[in-house]
Amino acid sequence: MNFNLKQKLDLAPKKPGCYLWKNHLNEIIYIGKAKNIYKRVHQYFNGPKDLKTSKLVNEIFYVEFIEVNNENEALLLEANLIKKHKPRYNILLKDNNGYPYILMTKEKYPRLIYTRNFDPKKGKHYGPFASSEMKAYDLYNLLLKLFPLKNCFNKKGRKCEFYDLNLCMKACTHEVSEADYEVMKKKIDYFFHNGADQVLKDLKEKESIASEKFDFEQAKKYLDLQKAINLIFDKQIINLYSAKERIDVLAYQIKENVICIVLFSYVSSQLVSKNTICDFYYGEEQEVITSYLSQYYKDNIKPKILYASLDQANATLLKDSLGIEIINPTSGKMNEIMSLALQNVTNELSQKYDSLVKKEQRINLALDQLKKLIKVDKLNHLEVYDNSNLFNTDKVSAMIVFENNQFNKKKYRKYKIKDQQALGDYHYMYEVIYRRLYQALKNNFVDLPDLIILDGGKHQVLAAKKAIVDLQIDKKINLIGLAKNNKHQTDKIVTFDLDEISLDKSSALYFFLANLQEEVHKFAISFFRKTKAKSLYDSILDQIKGLGKKRKQQLIEHFKTIDEIKKASIASLSQVLPIEIAKKLKQKLDQS
């Protein structure tokens, strides 16, 4: 333990709050919460430590403390900090489960919005729609036709693009009363809570009335809506998301330093989703569980009741901070469901434990083989580079980072080749390595890799070597290239001195390097395709009169990705653009 850390620990507050362990690069590696910060942080260094805690403690270089009023606040703060910083030793949840919701906003005249983010502050969420049988975006577009709520951002009382098309209730000009609007909101709520039967019945009646009046165009419209409902709407699936009560069941199991957690969500006694995480863990087991739940319910609907085996202190803490009743079932139907969850978690752990541990062992073996081969002592931080282009257009390069036995995606970097005169991999590699190491030079070499790996042979190694020599830092950097044979298979390592070392294709090292190549290639190709797509997208947009820089930016901010813009209907595009421009854009995108 260094002097600064010891001094900081001695001054730790004896109050509730969060502690942030940092490594020698000042990176946050673990975040925890405590009722008494002083007691908790000293537990890491006092008394016997198991393997998992020892690994964490060996990397601790400094610590920060954040005091709060009580343990409830500490738990919520911990979840926010973990989501923000994503420390590698915390059990991390994905940013969201990828399932979409349909949101009714809290505005005076609410809008329906298709979103993948759960944020109760914005309004009422219907979903998540996890089933592949339910095409949620099709359902969203259908709802806009069935229930024509406000579909624009107009706040100035002027007619919107949907007004003359009769695709909205004319809320933009305040021609609809709040009472009528409230009726439409209740119809949507009824639709989700009770299914499509009533809507289908109403549409059938409207179709009959229109036919009797010989208004066959209107009758066909009502018939098409019925067909659309029957095509994408599975009543049973919708009912799973419409019940007033939701119950979650959590089970977990530990084997050595691996924890497996399974969370079931039930609505109307039917299982609607299952979330599983299996990973190495650091810290106390109940602390890990409370941290997991606090993170999970930040981005997911909270149940009325959570059934889980938690000690009284943590159950009370979660109840107070999250507002969820927590019950440890001992008999009856819920005990049977808990047994099912335990059976699932046992199966998950048995399936994943060996693969997790064996993966760790294979990585350690591969790194030991590489150390011996290139005669280095330390390989904790690797950077791998690859270039991608098509006939010297849209030239890009990518860097991935493998650190402490895992990919560190926070440190991945994408590079657009700036030198427009540069032609070929030699020049691209020189520029990228020079830019990366020049940045390190400016930062006093705080985050230099132990080894740079290039997806290429002597040609690329020569380019990187020149960049290193030009920056006069050749004594600080280890470098290798991965050379391919005439069958385009990697079979040699090229060293800094351009020596070639053959690889044993049955070794752990060979498969490890192949995995690094696959990851960096995938990352580089993905970036290249996005760059290429953006070039094409920009050229299409430039052909459309009325689409300036500001409107292009609004499109990206609203739809997030080019793919989402391509999939958007004219109605959706019209939420951002004037209707005529939206039509032209849709036509161009369909032709591209």
From Swiss-Prot:
Record GO biological process: nucleotide-excision repair; SOS response
UniProt keyword annotations, A-Z: Cytoplasm, DNA damage, DNA excision, DNA repair, Excision nuclease, SOS response
Q: Which Pfam families match?
A: GIY-YIG, UvrC_RNaseH, UvrC_RNaseH_dom
Occurrences of domain GIY-YIG (ranges): 14-91
> Transmembrane ranges?
none
Q: Does the keyword Iron apply?
A: no
Q: Does the keyword Lyase apply?
A: no
- List residues of the UVR domain: 197-232
Top-level taxon? Bacteria
Give the family this protein belongs to, as stated in its UniProt record. Answer: Belongs to the UvrC family.
> What is the protein's quaternary organization?
Interacts with UvrB in an incision complex.
Role played: The UvrABC repair system catalyzes the recognition and processing of DNA lesions. UvrC both incises the 5' and 3' sides of the lesion. The N-terminal half is responsible for the 3' incision and the C-terminal half is responsible for the 5' incision.
Q: What is the protein named?
A: UvrABC system protein C
What organism, scientifically named, is this protein from?
Answer: Mycoplasmoides gallisepticum (strain R(low / passage 15 / clone 2))
Annotated gene? uvrC
